[in-house]
Amino acid sequence: SRGLGDVYKRQQEGYPYAMFRVGLYLEKAVLGEAKPEEAFAWYTKAAMADENEGIFALGRCYKQGIGTEEDWDKALEWFGKGAEKNESRCLTELGLAYENGNGVEENPQKAVEYMTRAAEQDYGYAQFKMGDYYFFGCGPCLEDNKKAVEWYEKAVANEIPMAMLRMGDYYLYDYDSLNESEKAFAYFKKAAEYEWYNEGLGICYEMGIGVEDNETEAFKYYTLAADNGNVTSMYRTGLCYYNGVGVKQNYAEAYRWFTDAAGNENIGAAYYLGKMQMYGEGCTPDPEAAVQWLLKAAEKNNDKAQFELGNAYLTGNGVEENDDIAMEWFEKAAENGNEKALKITGRRRK
């Protein structure tokens, strides 16, 4: 195309930005097939000519192993050169490196310093990270929901979907007792426009929070989020199939989703997986395997799993029958408010 010819002409004339663009075209397969090694060579030329885009791209290549061997030392060297020029993405990369200990020793203080510099330049992702630093606490950023929200809102204004989800969670789970959960829906819906999902939008539709309740829509958004790897949504998708919420009841599908979620450490899913294996719901009964999943959930204080373990020891299903151990689990379940366990322990005490 004429535009591409202009880029080549300019790189031949020594325009550093054009060198970067040629590298980008080669990396992203604009010219046909991707040619990462050639892209790396052009990024190097642009970076050596002190072009900001080239500097960042070269650092990214060394970080991700694009067209060259992964090399954190060289990646940080180039990100450092960009940071000296106050390049926001390079500052952000240095912040992430110090946050996670990639190529350097973990240093929360430096992570915050670099991320603050990037965020103050109105760089959206850095603003999101600053929100996280204040929300979860990082180095000099003590937990401070007010400051976290200020940064998240700036990131939302810069169209960062992750910040939209954080703000949705902030209102949905009412971290500061504002009783404004209806505001969550708008943030979750906005994130969905960018195809970013967590369990929040499904919960809003299922519970009628900020929108009229709609189980079909709830199931739709749970599955979208689950397909994107959100573990809580995998669990909730399993619940929908198990209970017939927004979809026809299907134990086999419920079992599949609970398996995925439990494999990712979701405690509720571990309970349901154990329960289904115990009674053969959507699968072949396997009491021994069931006990292992129930134990995993029970040890995290899931009262239903504790009650089921009590039953298992009481009847010798999947374990050797033992009334004393059964009562221990019933007692633990009762302490966690399980009504069935309370009845059993109450009768025993009389």
Please identify what each model-predicted range represents.
Residues D324-K350:
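Leucine-rich solenoid repeat scaffolds
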Residues R21-K28, I55-Q64, E93-N100, K129-G137, ...:
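Hydrophobic face of amphipathic alpha-helices that form TPR/SEL1-like repeat modules
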Residues K9-R10, K45-A46, K81-G82, R117-A118, ...:
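Canonical positions in the second alpha-helix
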